[in-house]
Amino acid sequence: MTGQLVQYGRHRQRRSFARISEVLELPNLIEIQTASYEWFLREGLKEMFTDISPISDFTGNLVLEFIDYSLSEPKYSIDESKERDVTYSAPLRVKVRLQNKETGELKEQEVFMGDFPLMTESGTFIINGAERVIVSQLVRSPSVYYNAKLDKNGKRGFGATVIPNRGAWLELETDAKDIVYVRIDRTRKIPVTVLLRALGFGTDQEIIDLLGDDEYLRNTLEKDNTESTEKALIEIYERLRPGEPPTVENAKSLLVSRFFDPKRYDLANVGRYKMNKKLHLKNRLFGQKLAETLVDPETGEVLAEAGTILDRRNLDRILPHLENGLGYIDAEPTGGVAEGEPFGLQSIKVISPDDPDGERILNIIGNGNIDRSVKHITPADIIASINYFFNLLHEVGTTDDIDHLGNRRLRSVGELLQNQFRIGLSRMERVVKERMSIQDQNAITPQALINIRPVIASLKEFFGSSQLSQFMDQTNPLAELTHKRRLSALGPGGLTRERAGFEVRDVHYSHYGRMCPIETPEGPNIGLINSLSSYAKVNEYGFIEAPYRRVDPETGLVTGDIQYMTADEEDLYVVAQANMPLTEDGHFADEQVLCRFRGQNLSVEPSRVDYMDVSPKQVVSAATACIPFLENDDSNRALMGANMQRQAVPLLQPDSPIVGTGMEYVSAKDSGAAIVAKHPGVVERVTAREILIRRTSDVNGSEVSGDLDRYKLQKYVRSNQGTCYNQKPIIAAGDRVEKGEILADGPSMDMGELALGRNVVVAFMTWDGYNYEDAIIMSERLVKDDVYTSIHIEEYESESRDTKLGPEEITRDIPNVGDDALRNLDDRGIIRIGAEVKDGDILVGKVTPKGVTELTAEERLLHAIFGEKAREVRDTSLRVPNGGDGIILDVKVFDRENGDELSPGVNQMVRVYIVQKRKIHEGDKMAGRHGNKGVISRILPEEDMPYMPDGTPVDIMLNPLGVPSRMNIGQVLELHLGMAAKKLGIKVATPVFDGAREEDVWATIEEAGMDKDAKTRLYDGRTGEPFDNRVSVGVMYMIKLAHMVDDKLHARSTGPYSLVTQQPLGGKAQFGGQRFGEMEVWALEAYGAAYTLQEILTIKSDDTVGRVKAYEAIVKGESVPKAGVPESFRVLIKELQALGMEVKMMSADDEEVEMKDEDDDNIPNATSALEQVVQPTVTEEE
């Protein structure tokens, strides 16, 4: 036997073909959501309140401080929130202190700051009763970036950009004349020396002393016509505020507020970290030749002589001294923005590498490693980044790759929420300041100052309408899981589809182990929406980290010590692949080891390896890791396979795959669809609706019983996508369970494993051409045995509102409706649970008052005697739409009188749930896990299907031509291995990139006693004759996708027309017609079918009068009259006339043809006939 047995959960054993032992457990797969939100509640909120606090009025007399905050218990539970259509949230209360400095009076108060949406345990939010997910956003990290560019003459220049988290951008660039310019906040460019002068380095000599002598600097100084700090400040002010009278003081305060004010300019933690890393000397001196002797400032010890080349070893020696003040200079600018605040720079002189004689000396200036708490940019940062730019012109330093994951970071839920909350708070701050100055200072309370509306509004806006707050994809557990792990480059502050180029979308070497190279949508979003890799984590700065095993440099031993590294850190090391063979004691077995280093694949000796991959599946995402034999599939098809698994409809009887990857258990457990034990214990009672577990704990070696845990199961609930969400227990009373064990399966789960489809017997063969173009031929057995039957639940609601003419009424008493239509309604006029309904049946009877007419005396008398009955009402009942037939599952009634919260103007709301059992049909779409999708073209009786020598008919026939050109050979291996496993009565696991090899598959086939070529002789079910050739028959895992023919089938009789063109609308949702387009018209022209063509262009479309007459003629059995003028022709003429052209319609003998306008005599009756005939669907509500 090849492979070894592995246990997945309590109930499932699989034979695994994995050769690499797992050194690291998979992390919790939705940690990216939950951890980020926890950070927000713990620290994010606190940060926000400390940022904004204290708020003082314009005189500085009143001071408002935020001291502490707390979240209370949520008003409704998660289930109640869904049922009542409200947000699952908890009230946020903030302790506020108001201090009046004049009187010394202190007032403390707890202020309610609105309801704060809470995250559920499974990483989602419930907003207005619907489950939503906040998708993490991939953005450029705030930092300073350098890039090289070629101008139109082919000359190499450079550009630099300082990108903050919020605030003004600072850009540097060179031009053809070798002058260095700066742009402040996207304005026109000015010579960079103007900015240096404005900082307080007023004279040319000061600037040269600061940056070192350099021809680029000399060119720039020549171009710069401001000689002093004052002139420079005024020049900058005129650029930023054109048209305002410039003064030096205004210019100073403008620059200070633009760059050095923490409220207006924010680099965030990550920006300061990246900035210090880029501008720090230790990274910039590597490989450079010193032009001065380095001496320790404290001891006077010589650290490195002039002329020394700083390699890794020399650099490591002087590194501690660099931190301690080696090369520090104190810059004391005069008169500029930074006046009176001396700042430290760190400068070391090196010999320029682009000067062969070694004459030119460069200053390398660092920003003095500014403290992490300084979130705004400082003069030292500006000088160091300008210096880096000048160094780049002399080949010292590196340009940045913006698509490298070291330069892109994630904004997860917590940070997105924090940014939104900050906007709300800053709006509130403005209101507080205004109120402080208006209201009586002695009578003011904190409660009266604070207006929480802007805070609540900004949160509502974010959860309700942000691009990153999405309606959760709940088709199946895998779709839920993937949605929570999605990374989007779109959204506010990100890219747009149109602007994003090829480079941003492409796979980058730094994605390895961080972002999946396979799972991304097809279409305009390709590469902009990605999925987190299976082992990846996000660090405090928002960079994605991948885990690696450390290799001991002394002994060459691959240790079990796991380190998470960002893409930047990984660039410094040589990393070996996870599948490199190791000896028993953990050394590399081969002389040469395959490794990666900065995107290059190298073969190096074991002593040079620093780290090793943790697992072969760390490259791919959770969905991609569910594809067996992924290594044998073409990447384009694997992409489709990963995406289509998310569209699998939960089946009535799910069945976990015979050929799995071992990822099914983890995905199902972490998705949030299963019920997982929170504490160890013993199961006391199990019913379909709840599981009771008595907690047990170990005290001094003896077992002690504790509390009773209640786990409620969801039964037949509608998911966001209308599929059935149902949980069923998989444990029995008396079982001992551990913490983290699965207690109940969710939808698309089988014994704790993900089960998206069914294992069916598949043959690769053609059959009378019915599987042309990827079509699928299926046996009727799959219909009869409900193999691919799914349950769908649709929700319909009807509201009774107050109208101008009186309230609507939900009632059984509906005008012009027979008793037959009311037989399933109860006395309230609402359908009973369990009733079978068809299209057009009444679900909720409702009448709306019509316009009131003046009553005659007789009518008034009748009215007085019989009461309300004579009132004019019309029928606005809720009816079953087309294709919505099924069985009533549940009815919920909400009534304002019973204290239910309803939206304004609504008195009563009824929700009806209809459940459908959909069997598989011709026209339904199915797929395997390898991107092999197709539509069912024919369902054959079981007896007509080809059968195997033992008489078993096959279930599905696929076209063999679908395999070679698409290069997804994984399906063929799955087919053979599945057949062998089925014969052996086992389930197997073949993990991605470490699964069954070809020889393992053959060995298993042999073990199962199958034929050597794994093919089978098949017999034609119709004639009993054997087919000429042997056929590949096996077991494949096939899923039914959410594209079902019942949702797409549509036919129109008479329906709505567009208002202007009077042509039928399009699409199923509008009950529209089929478009007879340009090409179809050509076809009729080619056949000379003149009359058919004419009626398609006129009476079947937009000849308003003609279509009414045609209808009457058909009803009366007369011949259809001649067609008239299409409405669109009239529209065209009116448009030309509107342009001032005189357009007339002439007959063949040059007589002007009168076009009848809408108000002509024969139209009114036509229109009224039209209303009766054409628009039964459009009522007077509009």
From Swiss-Prot:
List all Low complexity biased stretches. Answer: 1171-1182
Spans annotated as Disordered:
1150-1182
Q: Which CDD domains match?
A: RNA_pol_B_RPB2
Q: Does the keyword Transferase apply?
A: yes
Alphabetically list the UniProt keywords.
Answer: DNA-directed RNA polymerase, Nucleotidyltransferase, Transcription, Transferase
* Reaction equation(s) it catalyzes: RNA(n) + a ribonucleoside 5'-triphosphate = RNA(n+1) + diphosphate
**Which regions are flagged for Acidic residues bias?**
1150-1162
Q: Which PROSITE patterns match?
A: RNA_POL_BETA
* Top-level taxon in the UniProt lineage: Bacteria
Question: Which terms in the Gene Ontology molecular function aspect does this entry carry?
Answer: DNA binding; DNA-directed RNA polymerase activity; ribonucleoside binding
Function noted in UniProt: DNA-dependent RNA polymerase catalyzes the transcription of DNA into RNA using the four ribonucleoside triphosphates as substrates.
PANTHER family for the chain: DNA-DIRECTED RNA POLYMERASE I SUBUNIT 2 (PTHR20856)
Q: Spell out the family assignment given in the record's similarity comment.
A: Belongs to the RNA polymerase beta chain family.
Under the subunit heading, UniProt states:
The RNAP catalytic core consists of 2 alpha, 1 beta, 1 beta' and 1 omega subunit. When a sigma factor is associated with the core the holoenzyme is formed, which can initiate transcription.
The protein here is known as DNA-directed RNA polymerase subunit beta
Species source reads: Exiguobacterium sp. (strain ATCC BAA-1283 / AT1b)
